[in-house]
Regions:
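Conserved "HGTGT" condensation-loop signature of ketosynthase/thiolase-family condensing enzymes
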Residues: 1-83
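Active-site-proximal alpha-helical scaffold in enzymes
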Residues: 87-100
Length: 100
């Protein structure tokens, strides 16, 4: 069996505040865009995925220490393996490096 990787991206609407959506709903918005970019549906990708790597910075802004697992659960990726990566300003890049 050979390794297969997904390369895609999605971003939620950027605004100073989004009182209309929870943190988890914003993650789903970005995730849905990334999945659509691949020509798949969320449910199908969740079937194909073996696990996930989540990066989130910073706990203090959302007042939530478990944001990564909350997002993973909301996206339907539990109980698949997943872990969280943080590294200050390098958090996003470290997430891609870790997933590789």
């Amino acid at each position: 069996m050979r390794p297969v990787y997904m390369v895609s991206g999605g971003i939620s609407k950027f605004a100073k505040a989004r009182p209309d959506k929870t943190f988890q709903a914003l993650c789903m918005e970005a995730y849905s865009y990334a999945v659509q970019d691949l020509g798949l549906e969320v449910g199908k990708l969740n079937e194909l995925a073996d696990g996930c790597v989540i990066s989130y910075f910073s706990d203090h802004f959302a007042r939530q220490l478990m944001a990564g697992i909350m997002a993973q659960d909301y996206l339907g990726l539990c109980p698949k393996p997943g872990h969280r990566v943080e590294g200050g300003g390098a958090t996003g890049g470290l997430c891609f490096q870790e997933a590789w």
